[in-house]
């Protein structure tokens, strides 16, 4: 397969984006594999134009205020123009089924191989469900992070793991210096933050602190954030730190020893993988993370959504000695190295290489 040119589609190039601040690290790995990359993005940051030497950036810039129709027309014309002028071997769409459909519909070169990366539960809106389903027919391969992170069954779906900056987050711990808890998460009802916080407050760790790092994205998220602030306003050990730039997270995480993730199957959150790389002990709900732990350790890491299950688990770990905790952390830390950003382009492209 030729690796001269790739058409790369994504939602944002803004490193300050709450949900997609990591997307440029993905782009850089594909830029290393191809002679030239043409990027079409729905949100172009003003400082991106000179960041990548072999990447040409097109799309919709932050200051532009376009209607949905105007956005569609601009994207359609971009795809038509670029595919008429260039012979792309690959069209890769990162978390945008709609862009992948537009690109493939208007692509003049039908030999281009199309790959969609999608890692998320089933969309709630009917139109988004339909778009995601239709994208199955427009892409040669679908790549996703875990067994439950693509909501439709298809032989095209390939589970390849996630992509974290393992080397940046890596922190080999030799002791547990504190009992500080962190929840690294977008503030949203879907993340079950109350389950995590309430269970912590009822546990033997309740004299320690729990910090939520992350922020709201949608209007509904903002309402939920206000609700949480009101609910826990008398709890001085429940801290809402807000969003931290992704590049600063490795240093910030050094202050914590435990992380809770209460998201259900479908969410294969990078936060679990990043905190594991950072040497932080994890409590989780989604069985997709089981693969990163010694089977004998699952009774100390995985909980269910039933009442008091997480509290009981926290209490059992409270009684564990530090050596056992470090042993569990070390095993998981080594395992998540397989999901490093350094290998993401190879893992994606291997699904279409002969």
Where are these regions (language model features)?
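Conserved donor-binding/catalytic core segment of Leloir-type glycosyltransferases
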Residues: 7-9, 173-191, 197-202, 211-213
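Acidic anion/phosphate-binding donor-loop and adjacent secondary structure
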Residues: 67, 151, 159, 163-179, ...
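Short His-centered aromatic/hydrophobic patch
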Residues: 92-99, 118-121
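Nucleotide-activated donor-binding/catalytic signature segment of Leloir-type glycosyltransferases, i.e.
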Residues: 225-244
